[in-house]
Amino acid sequence: MAKKTKKPSNQIAANKKARHEYFIEETYEAGLVLQGWEVKAIRAGKMSITEAYVVFRGNEAFLFGAHIQPLLSSSTHVDPDSIRTRKLLLNRKEIDTLFGAVNQKGYACVPLEVYWKDSLVKCKIGLAKGKKLHDKRKTLKDRDWERDKERGFKQHLD
């Protein structure tokens, strides 16, 4: 029987810090408006969104603080700006929902991951509420407890 080949991951960049710092209430999928050199750099895996966040200006949403390191070979005729503000493509209803929650209810809008969907670059955005220090400690304590519990079951079965 032939071995199954692993399907390559579509994920480009992930914001692991966001799940530690925030409670994620809802997620939305948004498209990214990119330039040609940015797409080539993303294909080479040169993107980071750990310090990125979503900003609303007018009736549009923008990804601010995402870093794309330019390739030397692809951006020779353009002056690349690696921390450029990039427009997010969302429906009007989604923008209104996110904008209302961020302005009134004290929520934040953070990018969770960037990934390929067919040949398009998509960004998963989370509507998030900030965690307090004791919430972060509780999350770590619960994670450790689950790990110890699994270890105990494994030793008990052996």
From Swiss-Prot:
Keywords: Cytoplasm, RNA-binding. InterPro entries: SmpB (IPR023620), SsrA-bd_prot (IPR000037), SsrA-bd_prot_CS (IPR020081). GO terms for biological process: trans-translation. The keyword Phosphoprotein does not apply. The keyword Cytoplasm applies. It is found in: Cytoplasm. One of its GO terms (cellular component) is cytosol. GO terms for molecular function: RNA binding. Its main location: cytoplasm. Pfam families: SmpB. It comes from the Bacteria. HAMAP family: SmpB (MF_00023). Required for rescue of stalled ribosomes mediated by trans-translation. Binds to transfer-messenger RNA (tmRNA), required for stable association of tmRNA with ribosomes. tmRNA and SmpB together mimic tRNA shape, replacing the anticodon stem-loop with SmpB. tmRNA is encoded by the ssrA gene; the 2 termini fold to resemble tRNA(Ala) and it encodes a 'tag peptide', a short internal open reading frame. During trans-translation Ala-aminoacylated tmRNA acts like a tRNA, entering the A-site of stalled ribosomes, displacing the stalled mRNA. NCBIfam families: PRK05422.1, smpB. Belongs to the SmpB family. This is SsrA-binding protein. The gene is smpB.
